[in-house]
């Protein structure tokens, strides 16, 4: 099928739906593929088990998520004065089924009933906006949960948040989680496919909860509240270390090693 001198690298992010056409195409081109790169070890293991590509062709290659110079410039911007000194948690992502923000809205309904005075800021736009707005009103959370829409610069929000929630049903491994870790902000993430558990080292570098399980999410948040500052600092250090694997420079070095 291919008669080229160029080395062909197939990048796989997450676990794509393997319909007949995709399987058929992958099997045809598999012999001509130089490498298959996966964004996490979890995805690499899953792709290897399919038996379509030679195991020695499948590697993990961290995505180039962090542009350090851009990051350092953007994080210097001050947060809107109306939002400063607020006790808030943060969620960033498109308002879609995948991101599952309704789980967080329901969580903050529980917190309100417990008289815990915290806010949730949700940054992003998408097809679930009307649904989420209606849910916020239905649960009487208009003074607790706020849809802020799209923001060009999210870093001032990240660095000032108590923690970042990642409630996704699936990721690989999750750009916002990595950006938060680079900002030294703690992450509370769903244990979804593929990658959050790996990045957060099964809780060593953050907090994990069972995917789409509000009871488990509440337990993780309670753990966040109850852990001492030294333990939280330790988690931040491990997460920051892991986030450095996702800089553009780290990606360049890894690619250079692979290609050469």
What do the PLM-derived regions correspond to, one by one?
Residues 150, 169:
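Aromatic "clamp/platform" in nucleotide-sugar-dependent glycosyltransferases that forms part
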Residues 186-190:
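Short hydrophobic beta-strand element within catalytic cores of glycosyltransferases
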């Amino acid at each position: 099928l291919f008669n080229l001198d160029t080395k062909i690298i197939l990048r796989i992010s997450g676990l794509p739906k393997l319909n007949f056409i995709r399987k058929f195409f992958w099997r045809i081109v598999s012999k001509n593929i130089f490498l298959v790169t996966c964004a996490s070890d979890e995805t690499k293991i899953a792709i290897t088990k399919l038996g379509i590509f030679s195991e020695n062709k499948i590697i993990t290659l961290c995505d180039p998520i962090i542009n350090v110079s851009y990051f350092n410039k953007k994080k210097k911007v001050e947060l809107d004065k109306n939002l400063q000194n607020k006790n808030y948690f943060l969620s960033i992502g498109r308002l879609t089924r995948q991101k599952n923000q309704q789980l967080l809205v329901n969580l903050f309904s529980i917190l309100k009933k417990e008289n815990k005075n915290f806010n949730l800021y949700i940054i992003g736009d998408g097809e679930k906006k009307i649904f989420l707005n209606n849910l916020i009103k239905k649960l009487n959370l208009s003074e607790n949960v706020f849809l802020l829409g799209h923001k060009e610069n999210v870093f001032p929000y990240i660095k000032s948040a108590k923690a970042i929630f990642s409630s996704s049903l699936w990721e690989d491994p999750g750009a916002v989680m990595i950006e938060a870790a680079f900002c030294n902000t703690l992450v509370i993430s769903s244990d979804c496919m593929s990658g959050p558990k790996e990045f957060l080292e099964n809780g060593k570098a953050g907090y994990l909860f069972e995917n789409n399980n509000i009871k488990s999410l509440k337990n993780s948040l309670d753990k966040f509240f109850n852990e001492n500052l030294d333990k939280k600092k330790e988690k931040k250090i491990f997460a920051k270390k892991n986030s450095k694997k996702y800089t553009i420079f780290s990606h360049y070095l890894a690619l250079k090693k692979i290609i050469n």
